[in-house]
Amino acid sequence: MSSPASSITQAAAGALIAAVHTAAARIGFAAAVAVTDAGGHPKAFDRADAAPFLTAEVALDKAWTAASFHIPTHTWNDYLANARVAPLAGHPRLMAVGGGYPIIDNGRCVGGLGISGGSYEQDQQAAEQALTALGFEVPAH
């Protein structure tokens, strides 16, 4: 699903967005979905008609955070409790809210996935379902 350049392909990014919308509908919410390449640059994006406009920026920042550090965004809550790491909370794009996951293909981070629109638990659930459906690895964090 990735290219030799170690980033997610456009086709895989589009399939991931479709899988997220399917999962979100099944769970019961309208989502904004962002996919970045391995460098955190936007690769694909879509916002459901019923998703609030703020979800667009949040989804992109979740994807960026996940791609940047190769860990799910919800794990940042524990890290930010450490006084030596806490200053990172002031970074304007860092998202410590569930719904952002690195896209792991054959052990390599090929991008980031960010979902916004449901509760953080719903965003996480939709991300995990979509990643699993397309054969990407879901980090154990």
Residue ranges and their predicted role:
Residues M1-H141:
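Flexible, solvent-exposed loop/hinge segments and secondary-structure transition points
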